[in-house]
Amino acid sequence: MAQRHLWIWFLCLQTWSEAAGKDADPMVMNGILGESVTFLLNIQEPKKIDNIAWTSQSSVAFIKPGVNKAEVTITQGTYKGRIEIIDQKYDLVIRDLRMEDAGTYKADINEENEETITKIYYLHIYRRLKTPKITQSLISSLNNTCNITLTCSVEKEEKDVTYSWSPFGEKSNVLQIVHSPMDQKLTYTCTAQNPVSNSSDSVTVQQPCTDTPSFHPRHAVLPGGLAVLFLLILIPMLAFLFRLYKRRRDRIVLEADDVSKKTVYAVVSRNAQPTESRIYDEIPQSKMLSCKEDPVTTIYSSVQLSEKMKETNMKDRSLPKALGNEIVV
């Protein structure tokens, strides 16, 4: 009786082992954002396949083998136009991968003999890494020796990214080195890597501390802050001085206008020549002269000017030539 139970247990164990062997271990799949990924089924006897059901959180697609081509029914809208089945092998291809496509996928392969083989896949989606950026900071110490910190980073925060440095082989995104003027220039290369891509960049360090005062990037903000504070004080001061200058200039212009309005200008022509006022008086002869000519007698007489003419004479005293009054007889 005990021997019979042992045989039954052995048969059950063998059956369970065969069933477990048909279900492959979960496979890890790495996909690249925007590209495609292929889920390999490795079906040994395609002709025995009745149908294949793909699921990921919910139903994805249903494949029914046909005479010439498999019939594919996409049951989830987000995969429409992006799923393809490779004929005769029934491998599933997803194109134009998105970040939300990551997750667990399960394929239930149903054979004609009503046996089901299940395969499970874990899909991860990654971006291709761009060239990393290396930043350098240093602190000077005695004897022109400085401690240099090199930091390597990628453009965006990415998962599963590892960093390494050459020639030292440091496995970190930060590299600490000590450099002195006696050291030769060295080139340090940072390599960033994720499961689907890798990228690298290099920097050369050549006498960074020679005749260089102590420097640390954290204190680099201080001069910039002082410059901003200086500008905040200088700009309002310049604006105030300009406004004061403009107000004073306007006041001077107004005073000049008032003075010009009160000033009377007279125009004197230099070419004007004064005219002489002369009064002529002619004395007729009472008698006919004889044949013997008598000497001509000339009489000069002074004429008194009237009050009106005196006033005119007083106004014209400034002229270069005084007016004369002469009577010729």
UniProtKB/Swiss-Prot annotation:
Keyword Phosphoprotein: yes
Primary location group: membrane
Domain of life: Eukaryota
Residue positions the entry lists as glycosylated: 147
Classification via InterPro entries: CD2/SLAM_rcpt, Ig-like_dom, Ig-like_dom_sf, Ig-like_fold, Ig_sub, Ig_V-set
Transmembrane regions listed in the UniProt entry: 222-242
Outcome of mutating residue 300 to F: Modulates macrophage cytokine secretion
One Pfam family it belongs to: V-set
GO cellular component, one term: plasma membrane
Compartments, as annotated in UniProt: Cell membrane
S-S pairs: 152-190
Domain Ig-like C2-type: 132-206
Annotated consequence of substituting residue 265 to F: No effect on macrophage cytokine secretion
Post-translational modification: Phosphorylated by tyrosine-protein kinase LCK on tyrosine residues following ligation induced by agonist monoclonal antibody. The association with SH2D1A/SAP is dependent of tyrosine phosphorylation of its cytoplasmic domain. Phosphorylated on Tyr-280 and Tyr-300 following platelet aggregation. Phosphorylated on tyrosine residues upon high affinity immunoglobulin epsilon receptor aggregation in mast cells. N-glycosylated.
Domain Ig-like V-type: 26-129
Residue positions, PTM Phosphotyrosine: 265, 280, 300
Record function comment: Self-ligand receptor of the signaling lymphocytic activation molecule (SLAM) family. SLAM receptors triggered by homo- or heterotypic cell-cell interactions are modulating the activation and differentiation of a wide variety of immune cells and thus are involved in the regulation and interconnection of both innate and adaptive immune response. Activities are controlled by presence or absence of small cytoplasmic adapter proteins, SH2D1A/SAP and/or SH2D1B/EAT-2. Can mediate natural killer (NK) cell cytotoxicity dependent on SH2D1A and SH2D1B.
Record text on subunit structure and interactions: Homodimer; via its extracellular domain. Forms a head to tail dimer with a CD48 molecule from another cell. Interacts with SH2 domain-containing proteins SH2D1A/SAP and SH2D1B/EAT-2. Interacts with tyrosine-protein phosphatases PTPN6/SHP-1 and PTPN11/SHP-2 via its phosphorylated cytoplasmic domain, and this interaction is blocked by SH2D1A.
Protein name (record): SLAM family member 5
Organism: Mus musculus (Mouse)
